[in-house]
Amino acid sequence: MQIASSPFTHNQRSTRRIMLLVILACIPGIIAQTYFFGYGSLIQVMLAMITALLAEGAVLQLRKQPVMARLQDNSALLTALLLGISLPPLAPWWMIVLGTLFAIVIAKQLYGGLGQNPFNPAMVGYVVLLISFPVQMTSWLPPLPLQGTSVGFYDSLLTIFTGYTHSGENIHQLQVGYDGISQATPLDTFKTSLRSQPADQILQQPIFGGVLAGLGWQWVNIGFLVGGLLLLWRKAIHWHIPVSFLLALGGCAAVSWMIAPQSFASPMLHLFSGATMLGAFFIATDPVSASTTPRGRLIFGALIGILVWLIRVYGGYPDGVAFAVLLANITVPLIDHYTQPRVYGHKSGHK
């Protein structure tokens, strides 16, 4: 069944199935993320899901809504999943709990629940954490080939809950790669290094050892791309938003890179690093907070792509997907107003 707009307000069964399909489509990306960055992401997702179900159940109870029926729509689980995989794998446990509470209680239920929220709940929770705890939110481990210390499941669990592995290493020590240099994400490394080095020298660093983009990150993005194509094939999402998002981001990156290759990242680095594919197929396509008309979706997706590029290049944050999505959410009523198909026989009011 093809859904044109906000299906969550009128068909409980289709909502549950679509949410479950989106969750399953995340699996290829989660597998890649777990392989390159450890088991922490799985632990974060589990903590987020438990918190989301408890928080949503409590609020529904207070609102005297049918708790079990509403929880079974899987929307809380999907919000928790998207937030959990967006956080650094070894972020402290209280961060994912706080972010999930904010996403479910404030960004979703405060507006009336599923189908009423004007902003993407997972991205609201993410941005709150990023602004409040910037150091912890940028503490990503090096990808597996560059890790100086391998972090197993037990050490991941210990670090998330205590801040230390069984051998006493903290997150800052774990961030040091095999070469003794503290590692960052490809986008963060490129943005920071541009202050003192040209692009061709920056790209010689080990973190950029991937064929398409950053080492490890390219496979995470490919995983979410595979899942996104599955959603398109099953018609769970429309093609307009991801295609216009990726074309706008890739186009801006290509033009700037061709003009000044020593000062701008390549289109491939933008498309296959950070949260690009996750944002294009799983976050921006949220039918509640996105535009609902075909032309509107194209404008909405392109706006997000342009904003992501602007934030990555000129902003204070290395990625920018979350901020771009929330800023675009603000424009949805205006976009929908001017892109609604004209009713047959409609005449303008002027004489």
Swiss-Prot record:
GO terms for cellular component: plasma membrane. The chain crosses the membrane at residues 18-38, 40-60, 87-107, 121-141, 211-231, 241-261, 264-284, 298-318, 320-340. Its cofactor is FMN. This is Ion-translocating oxidoreductase complex subunit D. Its main location: membrane. Pfam families: NQR2_RnfD_RnfE (PF03116). The keyword Membrane applies. It is found in: Cell inner membrane. GO terms for biological process: electron transport chain; transmembrane transport. The complex is composed of six subunits: RnfA, RnfB, RnfC, RnfD, RnfE and RnfG. Part of a membrane-bound complex that couples electron transfer with translocation of ions across the membrane. Keywords: Cell inner membrane, Cell membrane, Electron transport, Flavoprotein, FMN, Membrane, Phosphoprotein, Translocase, Transmembrane, Transmembrane helix, Transport. It is a multi-pass membrane protein. The modification FMN phosphoryl threonine is found at residue 185. InterPro entries: NqrB/RnfD, RnfD_bac. PANTHER family: ELECTRON TRANSPORT COMPLEX PROTEIN RNFD, ION-TRANSLOCATING OXIDOREDUCTASE COMPLEX SUBUNIT D. Its EC number is 7.-.-.-. Belongs to the NqrB/RnfD family.
